[in-house]
Every structure is written in structure tokens, then in C-alpha cells.
Design a protein with these regions (language model features):
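Short active-site-adjacent helix-start/loop capping segments
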Residues: 11-14, 26-31, 44, 92-93
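Single, function-defining residue in the core of a domain
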Residues: 1-17, 21, 49, 53-60, ...
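A glycine- and small-aliphatic-rich helix-loop capping segment at beta-alpha/alpha-beta transitions
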Residues: 100
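A short glycine/small-residue-enriched secondary-structure motif
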Residues: 17-27, 32-40
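Major-groove recognition helix of helix-turn-helix-like DNA-binding domains
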Residues: 32-49, 59
Length: 349
């Protein structure tokens, strides 16, 4: 695992590159807990060592990170735990990854993810073929009483929403246009806040109503930044209308999470072609993300995760205290030093 974490931090492109980089630092590998391993050993470990080892370790880090960020303030003023759900597709070549079915001529995998918006820490992640619909992974997600689950329209399945309701939790989603409903009550709204309506509704069709028989709340909100009306669906009748709209806006954080992972870690190209190798690499990428998040909160660092990752990369083989990597003390240079170590001109020979 240490060698693969090394590869993630340095963004190595292939097993050969990992092997060459490790060989170049052979005398220093002991200090970071890595044994010198040939490319064939790394390839064999990728194929044969069960990815669930790394999955279990990542999940233990998820729990630790969430505990550390438990008291972090949300952008939206609510006391509940707030989670955002979404799925992100990673394209693969079907001829190289025939197990990753997506379309007839295209392969892909999908990361079904739920993040805790306090710290943007993954609270749930599973990896499937690209053809698995987002909502199919939803029943695997543990529902927490009083938790708020912010979802997009792909997750509207009334059986699952009823499970959330029965657990004593809440959902916030966009309303699908195809859903038929009947208005029961309308409440006054402050239109100066962008609100257009706040209504209590019941599902109209017998099939949908059998799955979700209770009232829900429908809120219309005008988004001036995009010049469109957004219609939200929730089972929370306590929070103000504008708070419901703000909660859905906060769902954007999971899009930023996926963007960060894809830009800063190695999750779009892989060191092996088997399902085990791909899942191993993704879970190790999650481990790196979680370690960075834990260090950021532990040392109260103001730097972004991208900066912290870069600090690790350039100091990987330095024998320093961890905190000194992230909070370096610049050496003060006095006047005598400036004269002694005067910068030479490029062509002054």
C-alpha cells in the first residue's frame, strides 16, 4: 500500500514509472516505510491482493475524519447532520476493461458517493459498473435519524424516500416534472428572498401514493444567477423555505469533491486492468484524500488540500516533523548572509 500511496502523491503514470522513481530513491525508502519492489511485484499485488483491505482501511479513516469535523460549521445554519449524494462516472476502454460494462462500445465505472457536508468527508462510497443507475446504490446507504439527505432527481424513488421518512430522517431534492401531485395547503412566502411558493402536496397516482402515502412539501424558488425556477421536494416541514433552498445549493460541494479527486489524484487512468486493480487504486486515492483532510483539521491548517498534497510531494523523502512540512519556518537571512551568498548573474563568468 505504501508504494501505491507514493504513486498517488507523485501522480506516477505507470508501474514502470513507480519502479523507476522508487529505484532513484532506493537509499531513502526505509525512512518512509517502503521496500524496494520490482514492477512485477507491484503488478502482482494489484491483481491478487483483495481491494477490500484498502476499502476497510479507508472506511476506518472516514469515521475518524468525520469525528474530527463533527463540530465544523455548515454554510447553512442547521443543527442536523447534512449529507450530499451523487454518482460520478469514470470512462474506461471496453477492450481493456471488459468487465466494466456501460454502453455497447464503451466501458465505465461509477463512484456512488455520499459526503458529510461538515468537512466534505466521504461517509459512503461504493464502486459499480457504469451501467448501474444512481438510485440502485441508494438502499446500501445507512440512514441516520434526523439526518438531512440532499439528492438530485436521479435518486427519486418513493420506496427509498419512504425509508428515509420512516427512519425519522429528511430528504431534499428537485421535483421531477413527470411526478403527478395534488396541492393540499399553500403557505405564504417572502418573495424578496426569491421564493415563489411553499405548498403541502400529496402524490396523485395510486402507484406512487401506495409507496409514499404521507404529505410532502413543495417549494418553488427563483434562482436569479441562472434565471430559472427551481422546484424542491422535501419531507421537512420545520425548516424555513429559504433554508431548504440553501441546503440544495450546498449539494454543489459533492461536485467539487469529484472535481478535486479527478484533478489531484490518480483515478482516471489505472495501473492494472482487472476489477481488483481498479478498485484498489480508487480506494487508495480515497485514503490519501482522507489523510490530507485529517491532517488539515488536526493541525488547523489554512492551506487547501491541493497545497497540502504538493507539500507532501516535495518533502516526501525529507526527514522532518510532519507539522514542519505544512508550516515551514522561513530562514531569516541577515545582511551579512546576503553579501556572502550574493546571487551571481547568469552570464557573469
Amino acid at each position: 500500500m505504501a508504494a501505491m500511496i507514493f504513486a498517488q502523491i507523485r501522480q506516477e503514470d505507470s508501474l514502470r514509472d513507480i519502479d523507476m522513481a522508487l529505484n532513484a530513491h532506493a537509499s531513502k525508502l526505509y525512512h518512509i516505510g517502503i521496500e524496494q519492489s520490482p514492477k512485477s511485484t507491484l503488478a502482482d499485488a494489484n491483481e491478487r491482493r483483495n481491494y477490500r483491505i484498502y476499502e476497510d482501511f479507508a472506511k476506518s479513516l472516514m469515521q475518524r475524519a468525520r469525528r474530527q469535523y463533527a463540530h465544523t460549521k455548515l454554510a447553512v445554519e442547521v443543527d442536523n447532520a447534512v449529507y450530499a449524494l451523487d454518482a460520478s462516472t469514470i470512462d474506461l476502454c471496453l477492450s481493456l476493461y471488459p468487465w466494466a460494462k456501460f454502453r455497447q462500445t464503451k466501458g465505465a465505472i461509477k463512484l456512488h458517493t455520499m459526503i458529510d457536508l461538515r468537512g466534505n468527508i466521504p461517509a459512503f462510497l461504493t464502486i459499480t459498473d457504469g451501467k448501474v443507475h444512481d438510485v440502485k446504490a441508494a438502499p446500501q446507504i445507512p440512514i441516520e435519524a434526523e439526518g438531512i439527505y440532499v439528492i438530485d432527481r436521479a435518486y427519486i424513488d418513493f420506496d427509498w424516500l419512504w425509508t428515509i421518512e420512516q427512519t425519522g430522517a429528511f430528504f431534499v431534492s428537485r421535483l421531477k416534472r413527470s411526478i403527478k401531485w395534488t396541492r393540499i395547503v399553500s403557505h405564504r412566502v417572502d418573495k424578496s428572498l426569491g421564493l415563489r411558493s411553499d405548498q403541502e402536496i400529496l402524490l396523485f397516482s395510486k402507484k406512487s401514493k401506495a409507496k409514499y402515502p404521507k404529505r410532502m412539501r413543495k417549494i418553488s424558488f427563483r434562482d436569479d444567477t441562472q434565471n430559472r425556477i427551481l422546484v424542491f421536494l422535501t419531507n421537512n416541514f420545520v425548516l424555513p423555505s429559504e433554508t431548504i433552498a440553501a441546503l440544495y445549493k450546498a449539494r454543489w460541494e459533492i461536485e467539487l469533491f469529484f472535481k478535486w479527486i479527478k484533478q489531484n489524484l490518480k483515478v482516471k487512468s489505472f495501473y492494472g486492468t482487472s476489477s481488483n486493480a481498479v478498485k484498489t487504486q480508487i480506494w487508495i486515492a480515497m485514503i490519501v484524500y482522507l489523510v490530507l483532510a485529517i491532517l488539515k483539521e488536526r493541525y488547523k491548517l489554512e492551506n487547501g488540500l491541493s497545497q497540502l498534497l504538493h507539500f507532501l510531494e516535495v518533502n516526501l523523502f525529507e526527514r522532518k516533523l510532519l507539522i514542519s512540512i505544512f508550516q515551514p519556518n522561513p530562514r531569516k537571512v541577515n545582511v551579512e548572509d546576503k553579501i556572502k551568498y550574493k546571487q551571481l548573474k547568469l552570464f557573469d563568468f
